[in-house]
């Protein structure tokens, strides 16, 4: 007598035969996988090649899913940020080598900061043939520096105001003149007839420089207010200050108008 097979077992072991219709379905067990992980797959065509393609696609999806999950748990290290630029070195941090002692001596002798000492050296390079003069008023409240030749050409004006205050000066461009200190101590007098600004120290009354209103690019500096050691020679050139009678008449009118004494300034201060 023949054995009676279980219908489910027979259906599972059944293989496709050439005579089966194309629409027949075959149940294929997935090799190498457990029933829980890889259930039976039904392919409409009943082809092993189609099942393998589907299985490969499923495995690739699982691999990508595991890779994404691993990346979210353990992200890749980000690229290191670029180092911030190093701050600019200050003059104190410059590698001066064997010249550091000379640098410090020069700076202390002139009483300058590192920036001021560097400016003096750069100005010396930019103004060849000129000398760095320093000066100020009698009490020291006003101090200035100017680049000018060692041989000074001094103007001696004969106008009424310059004769009364004995003002002699040499002219320099404003770019070469620097007021070091005392801006708050300066009192400026402006005459009524000539556009000139005569600056005096409010403490000691010494006039060390003046400027012209018409040409602020030029300063007149008093040579007798310069510090010693930088002037080699002085050449004085006298210039006329106009008609004394006309100046006296203008001064008389100004006295009655302003109730205070005023006198004309140098008429040639605007020149050069």
UniProtKB/Swiss-Prot annotation:
Residues 133-246 form the CENP-V/GFA domain. Zn(2+) 1 binds at residues 137, 139, 201, 204. Residues 77-88 have a biased composition (Pro residues). Residues 1-17 have a biased composition (Basic residues). InterPro entries: CENP-V-like, CENP-V/GFA, Mss4-like_sf. One of its GO terms (molecular function) is metal ion binding. Keywords: Metal-binding, Zinc. Its cofactor is Zn(2+). Binds 2 Zn(2+) ions per subunit. Signal peptide: none annotated. PROSITE patterns: CENP_V_GFA. Zn(2+) 2 binds at residues 157, 159, 162. Belongs to the Gfa family. This is Centromere protein V-like protein 3. It comes from Homo sapiens.
